[in-house]
């Protein structure tokens, strides 16, 4: 299915419900359909880089749009959490981050910040010859062996800061008390602060463990562990591109 009605579209999409009946549907890809924005919609409604869907399709087909350092020519390509979208000809670079109102939003970032992607480890697989495969949240995989294996054999939900498009790991942030984190899902999505307490569940820890964060203003908020993304040590990583 190429299109869906606007009333069937994910609730958070920034599109007018009465403009047209049909709207572009995300293609299956690195992000779930209900957690992503089709690339053409991102250009038109979020970035205001074009006036019409036809214009969006044209610059995408012409190879002028990059997602995570790679040219994407599919106007239905799903763009999601922490993706880096660039239009070099327009000197435009943005990162997709969680938002407390609209679930996903964009922030402008510098050329230096656009070199880095932040993504969580969701699970790990041991392959032949002792190679460890890290399966990341956006569908990509990283193979570790030798010194890298001992250095980056980290717990699931650890956030990796990787260079684009080579996928070289530069930094890792593990979820623990004291680190700076952002909530990426649930009713508190978009809120951020230091992790002050982690209450581990007896079973299904990733799903049911409860994490308490403290904002810079002293406010506290809670969410399940699966909704937490570590983004720095004492404060947010400078290359995230957002001032928190």
From Swiss-Prot:
What are the BP-aspect GO terms? translation
Record key words, sorted: Ribonucleoprotein, Ribosomal protein, RNA-binding, rRNA-binding
Q: Which SMART domains does this chain map to?
A: KOW, S4
Is-annotated flag, keyword Transcription regulation? no
The record's GO molecular-function terms, alphabetically, read: rRNA binding; structural constituent of ribosome
CDD domains assigned: KOW_RPS4, S4
Question: Which PROSITE patterns does the record match to this protein?
Answer: S4
Recorded protein name is: Small ribosomal subunit protein eS4
**Gene behind the chain:** rps4e
């Amino acid at each position: 299915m190429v299109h869906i009605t606007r009333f069937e579209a994910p609730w958070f999409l920034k599109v007018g419900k009465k403009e047209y009946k049909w709207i572009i549907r995300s293609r299956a890809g690195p992000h779930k359909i209900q957690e992503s924005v089709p690339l053409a919609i991102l250009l038109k409604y979020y970035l205001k880089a074009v006036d019409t869907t036809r214009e969006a399709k044209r610059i995408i087909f012409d190879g002028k749009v990059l997602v995570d350092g790679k040219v994407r020519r599919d106007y239905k390509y799903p763009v999601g959490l922490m993706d880096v979208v660039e239009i070099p000809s327009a000197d435009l670079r943005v990162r997709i981050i969680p938002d407390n109102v609209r679930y996903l939003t964009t922030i402008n970032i510098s050329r230096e910040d656009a070199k880095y992607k932040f993504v969580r480890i969701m699970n790990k697989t041991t392959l032949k010859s002792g190679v460890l495969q890290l399966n990341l949240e956006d569908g990509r995989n990283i193979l570790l062996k030798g010194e890298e294996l001992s250095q980056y054999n980290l717990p699931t939900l650890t956030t990796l800061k990787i260079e684009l498009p080579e996928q070289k790991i530069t930094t890792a942030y593990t979820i623990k008390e004291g680190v700076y984190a952002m909530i990426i899902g649930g009713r508190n999505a978009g809120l951020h602060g230091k992790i002050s307490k982690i209450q581990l569940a007896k079973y299904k820890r990733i799903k049911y463990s409860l994490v308490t964060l403290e904002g810079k203003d002293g406010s506290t908020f809670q969410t399940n562990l699966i909704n937490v993304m570590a983004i720095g040590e004492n404060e947010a990583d400078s290359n995230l591109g957002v001032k928190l």
